[in-house]
Amino acid sequence: MLETNDSVCELAYQLAYHPVYRSSQFWSMLVSSLSIPALIYFITRKIFFLHFHGNLKCLLIVYFICNLLFSMALCFAFFYQFLIPFFVTSKCQLLINTTLFKWGQICSFLLLTSSMLLPIGFSIERFVALGNAQKYESSRTFLGPVIIFIIIAVDFSIIFSVYKNEPFTEGFYSFILVPSTTASQINMYFFVLLFVKIFNLLLNCILLRIHKKIRIKYYSLSVRYEMEEILQSSKFTFIIRFTHLLFFGFYVVVILFVRIMGESFFNGTLNYSVARGVFCTVPTYNLIIVIIGIKSLRHLNLQRLNKVQSTVQIKSTGKEGSKNYEDIITNYWDSVSSRTP
């Protein structure tokens, strides 16, 4: 047991001063710290003031709050791992306290997986909105909180079942590296989440196609306006899901590849551990999504404004313009005739 501990301490020491691993820690620390004020601004100044229905807004707020809390957890983790080598006096002091590692990783994974599952709620809410377009905007905010509760409860149950028998007896030198006794279950859960996210993105594509087909059936100006609101909000959630899938998909594919190939492929435990630790793309996503979100909202709002203006304007050219002119003249003379004694 002592020999194993010594080998773990030696590995922690080599990782702490490995240039590639060290650079990845610094990058993750930097983007995590930058993403915190960026997400706070995005939530309080953009998401809170969206014109979307309360159900979708509630889902978006909780989704980005999960990202914010996860960024805070990552910021602490990477600051800790980056700075601790400057203050230790022995190699084994580089190992993370077991209790700190246990609760840090469980809470971090719960926030990470919750943010991966919450976009499923976007699809459910959007299909309900599309199916009840004529009266959905006047409905109360109830569906969103229910979906949030169910998704978080399911995710909590899965994470609890994964970690309930984990003894946490290994020496831990990184918050993002899963214990070997739990790694297979976490990998399986991530693999399932990847397929769920792909399926969810396909559902969003189907939703947008259905929207384009049925919106021509509505002639009421108010319903057409509601349909345009649903379309714009669905496009925004599509952008979020697509961006999340790119980053998360890359992370899962790379991590599974590293684990499947094993230590022999990377010529030793050190290179294998470096490969496992440097491909965490989630901190970068938490910063990039704010930039993409602000730009996409600006574009969609401009698109929405132009669409609404074109919808309420009366055309004055072509066959439709001629018909509008005749209708106006007819209505005018009918009103004059009705006032003539």
From Swiss-Prot:
Q: Note the Pfam families from the entry.
A: 7TM_GPCR_Srb
Query: Which Gene Ontology terms cover its molecular function?
Result: G protein-coupled receptor activity
Alphabetically, which GO biological process terms does the record hold? sensory perception of chemical stimulus
Q: Where are the transmembrane segments?
A: 24-44, 59-79, 104-124, 142-162, 188-208, 238-258, 277-297
Q: Where does tissue-level expression of this protein occur?
A: Expressed throughout the head.
Q: Give the UniProt keywords, A-Z.
A: Cell membrane, Cell projection, G-protein coupled receptor, Glycoprotein, Membrane, Receptor, Transducer, Transmembrane, Transmembrane helix
Instruction: Indicate which residues are glycosylated according to the record.
Output: 5, 97, 267, 271
Membrane is among the record's keywords: yes
Topological domain (Cytoplasmic) residues are: 45-58, 125-141, 209-237, 298-341
Among InterPro entries, the record links this protein to: 7TM_GPCR_serpentine_rcpt_Srb (IPR002184)
Cell compartments where the protein resides: Cell membrane; Perikaryon; Cell projection, Dendrite
Entry membrane topology: Multi-pass membrane protein
Extracellular topological segments: 1-23, 80-103, 163-187, 259-276
A Gene Ontology CC term for this entry? dendrite
**Reported function:** G-protein coupled receptor.
**Family per similarity comment:** Belongs to the nematode receptor-like protein srb family.
Q: What is this protein called?
A: Serpentine receptor class beta-3
Recorded source organism is Caenorhabditis elegans
Gene encoding the protein? srb-3
